[in-house]
Amino acid sequence: MQTINELKHYTFQAMLENSIKRFGERPALSFVSGEPISYNEAGEQIKQLQQRLYCLGVNPGDKIAIYSHSVPHWGIAYFAIVTMGAIAVPLLPDFTDKEVKACLEHSETTMIIVSEKLMSRVPDTVSVLIDIQDFSVKKGTEIRNGNPPPHTCKEDDTASVIYTSGTTGRSKGVELSHKNLVCNAIAGQSCQRINEYDRALSILPLSHVYEFTIGFLMFFLNGACVYYLEG
């Protein structure tokens, strides 16, 4: 069980650094029938994606949407975005093209990481489009070289703009800070103790805050492995 004493700060940077340090070679993320990604490997993939985003012009405070069914690279993409100071905009995979366009316009988001299945729903107004499967750039131009400069996240920095499912009308955007989300993951351990030998099957969309915090972050925080269904 991890507490704020281990993390020192309620930020995704603190969580990521702690998990890699404590559980480096342990399996972290995987498809049910695939080869797991270790915590060390996840950390390297996060750095590689951050470099790609930086070369594409991403700066702290920029918004990047994640539009995909739940897959191992969803969490990689999220950590890469928020630990470089940018803001993640998770979109539900069942959003229509009109709903996607409305959310992107409302949040002023022009960059998106998306699964191949959902690419046809992404509007032409998007300037940067990245395939979540291998983080290849499908649309966009690199404007600089090198690595992103060091960035220190603060607890009250906005980590996500979450859009509701829109059951009472148009989806509404809600800003959530690093502290909001990391604190929820820590608090969730009072209901279910997790350790590095646990394994979880995630079936709900990671764009739901519940699944993201309890079905992903709480396990990542404690060195467990989260599995996802393919297809």
Outline where the language-model segments fall.
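Conserved AMP-binding/adenylation subdomain of ANL enzymes
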Residues: 182-199, 206-231
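Conserved ATP-dependent adenylate/AMP-binding module captured primarily in the ANL superfamily
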Residues: 93-122, 184-201
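Conserved AMP-binding A3 loop
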Residues: 38-40, 159-185
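Conserved AMP-binding/adenylate-forming core of the ANL superfamily
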Residues: 8, 17, 25-71, 75-79, ...
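Structured binding elements
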Residues: 85
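ANL superfamily adenylate-forming
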Residues: 117-155
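Conserved coil-to-alpha-helix start sites within the AMP-binding
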Residues: 68-79, 94-98, 204-221
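Conserved pre-ATP/AMP-binding loop-to-beta segment of ANL
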Residues: 24-27, 145-163, 170, 193-199
